[in-house]
């Protein structure tokens, strides 16, 4: 069956809801504070990502649709950082600034892949005059094909019923990702998208699919909804509409790595697809495919048109894995258009061991995409001697490409990947070992382009050389 993606470029979607900024501080921990029994984290990496309703808008923009975002912020650095991050990925922001409140910010401190603490900077926006939000919605209704209301119970949607009525009068579908158990406030919405836990918190525990349908249809009638989509994790999702046969879609996820933000992806793809002129059933089909992609990524993520197309055509591996240099350049260009941060590293990776896997996982966390450049067999032989490599290039690249942390694998013939790096110009160049940043091949080119260069430590006790020596000793023994 030939599947054609929706014409996302002609879709206009407004997202209104609770916007927030997610901050991440990363660093090693090697001692306990003398002031209190707590670890000391030496912060070496800081990341800022749009969260809440802002992540929904990013998901819409990543598809190539026209995304507008309305929400409440303070007048502070967090609001400015949020606006800049969203502008970089083509989300049009029209925030209402509230000088008496801070922008909702969640700061997470992480070390050795563990979150040590989360600090929330927020004051609920309940009681803030909703009229400026209503005015922004009214101004946009003639130019959008869908309105998303993203509720995190922080106060931006205190007047959600008025917002629903504004859109209904204009004939614009309203999609809501609900929060809490008071679904009365969402009366008259086009579509609610609760997950199974949220759904059962309202209707009670459902032991069978039939119970989900029965109670879901009653919910639709009670609150005058047009449809209900219950997302059910590994069991897929169920679309319920009055007078129509329930549509149960199995999950398309090959491997679940992280469900963070999956709900944002689902409602974002639903809205963009509906706004492009497709049916609700088609929108659910694409949203289900997108969810299968995004849960295979670490952290809050978005889905690109290429990834979505590959997923719906059953070719989730196309566009990723082992690539030629020219294919890689095209993939990187597409990633940059989506506002993704590209990380690059290189090495021989002859006998893949735990140290390699840990190193690559840590490198991947520093960005959105990870490129691994691999020395060819001839290059490896010149660097390591006639007995190397143990594993030929093709096998080394296939194994690397199968790792969850690795997006793209490419080879190079030279002793160093300097020429390759100069052609790719990653946002962040990473190398493991005892190098100084200025000693790393390609560092000058990356710096000249405004990028960063970082040295990561390898896991102690892990090396290909030691593994080979042990094998040789075991043979002699």
Curated annotation (Swiss-Prot):
Entries under SUPFAM superfamilies matching the protein: Nucleotidylyl transferase (SSF52374), Ribokinase-like (SSF53613)
Pathway in which the depicted protein is active: Nucleotide-sugar biosynthesis; ADP-L-glycero-beta-D-manno-heptose biosynthesis; ADP-L-glycero-beta-D-manno-heptose from D-glycero-beta-D-manno-heptose 7-phosphate: step 1/4; Nucleotide-sugar biosynthesis; ADP-L-glycero-beta-D-manno-heptose biosynthesis; ADP-L-glycero-beta-D-manno-heptose from D-glycero-beta-D-manno-heptose 7-phosphate: step 3/4
Region (Ribokinase): 1-318
Family: In the N-terminal section; belongs to the carbohydrate kinase PfkB family. In the C-terminal section; belongs to the cytidylyltransferase family.
Cellular component, GO annotation: cytosol
InterPro entries from the UniProt entry: Bifunc_HldE, Carboh/pur_kinase_PfkB_CS, Cyt_trans-like, PfkB_dom, RfaE_dom_I, RfaE_dom_II, Ribokinase-like, Rossmann-like_a/b/a_fold
HAMAP family cross-referenced by the UniProt entry: HldE
Catalysed reactions listed for this entry: D-glycero-beta-D-manno-heptose 7-phosphate + ATP = D-glycero-beta-D-manno-heptose 1,7-bisphosphate + ADP + H(+); D-glycero-beta-D-manno-heptose 1-phosphate + ATP + H(+) = ADP-D-glycero-beta-D-manno-heptose + diphosphate
Protein name: Bifunctional protein HldE
Enzyme class name: transferase
Top-level taxon: Bacteria
EC number(s) on file: 2.7.1.167, 2.7.7.70
Role: Catalyzes the ADP transfer from ATP to D-glycero-beta-D-manno-heptose 1-phosphate, yielding ADP-D-glycero-beta-D-manno-heptose.
CDD domains tied to this protein: RfaE_like
Region described as Cytidylyltransferase: spans on this chain: 344-477
Record text on subunit structure and interactions: Homodimer.
Sequence intervals crossing the membrane: none
PANTHER family: BIFUNCTIONAL PROTEIN HLDE (PTHR46969:SF1)
């Amino acid at each position: 069956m030939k599947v054609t993606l929706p014409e996302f470029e002609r879709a206009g979607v407004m997202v209104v809801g609770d916007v927030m900024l997610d901050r991440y501080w990363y660093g090693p921990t090697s001692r306990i504070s003398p002031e209190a029994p707590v670890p000391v984290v030496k912060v070496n990496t800081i990341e800022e990502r749009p969260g809440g309703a802002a992540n929904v808008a990013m998901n819409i923009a990543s598809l190539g649709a026209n995304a507008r975002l309305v929400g409440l912020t303070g007048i502070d650095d967090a609001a400015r950082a949020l606006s800049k991050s969203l502008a970089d990925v083509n989300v049009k922001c029209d925030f209402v600034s509230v000088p008496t409140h801070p922008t909702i910010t969640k700061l997470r401190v992480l070390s050795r892949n563990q979150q040590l603490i989360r600090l929330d900077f927020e004051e609920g926006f309940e009681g803030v005059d909703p009229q400026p939000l209503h005015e922004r919605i009214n101004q946009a209704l003639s130019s959008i094909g869908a309105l998303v209301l993203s509720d995190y119970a922080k106060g931006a949607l205190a007047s959600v019923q008025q917002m629903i009525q504004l859109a209904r009068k204009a004939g614009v579908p309203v999609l809501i990702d609900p929060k809490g158990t008071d679904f009365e406030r969402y009366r008259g919405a086009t579509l609610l998208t609760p997950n199974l836990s949220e759904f059962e918190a309202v209707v009670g525990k459902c032991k069978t699919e039939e119970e989900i349908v029965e109670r879901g249809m009653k919910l639709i009638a009670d609150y005058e909804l047009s449809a209900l989509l219950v997302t059910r994790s590994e069991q897929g999702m169920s679309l319920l509409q009055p007078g129509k046969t329930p549509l149960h879609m199995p999950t398309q996820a090959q491997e679940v790595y992280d469900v963070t933000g999956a709900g944002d992806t689902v409602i974002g793809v639903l809205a963009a697809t509906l706004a492009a002129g497709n049916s609700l059933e088609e929108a659910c089909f694409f949203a289900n495919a997108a969810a299968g992609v995004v849960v295979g990524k670490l952290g809050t993520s978005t889905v690109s048109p290429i990834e979505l197309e590959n997923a719906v055509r059953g070719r989730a591996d196309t566009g990723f894995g082992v690539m030629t240099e020219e294919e890689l350049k095209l993939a990187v260009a597409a990633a940059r258009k989506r506002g993704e941060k590209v990380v690059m590293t290189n090495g021989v990776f002859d006998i893949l061991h735990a140290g390699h896997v840990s190193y690559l996982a840590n490198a991947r966390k520093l960005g959105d995409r990870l490129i691994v450049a691999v020395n060819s067999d001839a290059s490896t032989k010149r660097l390591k001697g006639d007995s190397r490599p143990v594993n030929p290039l093709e096998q080394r690249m296939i194994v690397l490409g199968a790792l969850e942390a690795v997006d793209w694998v490419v080879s190079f013939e030279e002793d160093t990947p300097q020429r390759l790096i100069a052609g790719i110009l990653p946002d962040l160049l990473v190398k493991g070992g005892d190098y100084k940043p200025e000693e790393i091949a390609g560092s000058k080119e990356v710096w000249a382009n405004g990028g960063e260069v970082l040295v990561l430590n390898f896991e102690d006790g892990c090396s290909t050389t030691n593994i080979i020596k042990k094998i040789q000793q075991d043979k002699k023994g």
